[in-house]
Amino acid sequence: MQPMCGRLNRMLGNDYKDQQCSIAGALEVIGERWSLLIIREVMLGVRRFDQLQSDLAVARNVLQTRLTRLVDQGVLEKRLYQQRPKRYEYMLTEKGLDLWPTIVALMQWGDRYAAPAAGAPVLLEHRGCGGAVDEHRLCAACGARLSARDVLASAGPGARADHPLRRRAAAKAAQRAAA
């Protein structure tokens, strides 16, 4: 009997191009270590290079290579937001937005099997009413079907003090207090 995704005895090379499998094809686009984390960050509103680099603690050259690949693959779009010096932000394309169910499923799987004992590091909530996102990507409070555009992220009980979402929340609170 032939396995679904190629032969078991075939040695896996540096890529999946010879695999006749949709999962292998998807991994060619998003399977690199940083790719899904970059997509998650952009989905949650982090779109500029410096913020992505800071939040992910990834080397600048690695981030640039991954962003270029995601743009070339049509997952992200690069948009100019400043002329001098030229600076860009990264937006999800329709192809990138279609990864929303995958991102939520991986987050929820990680919350169940790989989160700190304190709980989920990131909580997703409905922008409209504040309800939690359930396993079907529905709002647990109002029942609305949610897309990436409908959701806000906040630091969960498992987020360390230095988590980017905690730092951003503290900075916003300080700005409000100073105003």
Predicted regions and their residues:
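Extended, folded domain segments that form the structural surfaces/walls around functional sites
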Residues: 39, 47-52, 99, 109, ...
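Short aromatic/hydrophobic contact patches that present stacked aromatics
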Residues: 55, 89-91, 123-125
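Canonical helix-turn-helix DNA-binding module
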Residues: 49-81, 85
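N-terminal helix-turn-helix DNA-binding core of bacterial DNA-binding proteins
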Residues: 21-62, 176-179
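Alpha-helical linker/hinge and terminal dimerization helices associated
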Residues: 36, 73, 102-113
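Short, Lys/Arg-enriched N-terminal segment that forms or immediately precedes the first helix
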Residues: 2-27
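Basic, amphipathic "hinge/linker" alpha-helix immediately C-terminal to the N-terminal HTH DNA-binding motif
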Residues: 31, 82-105
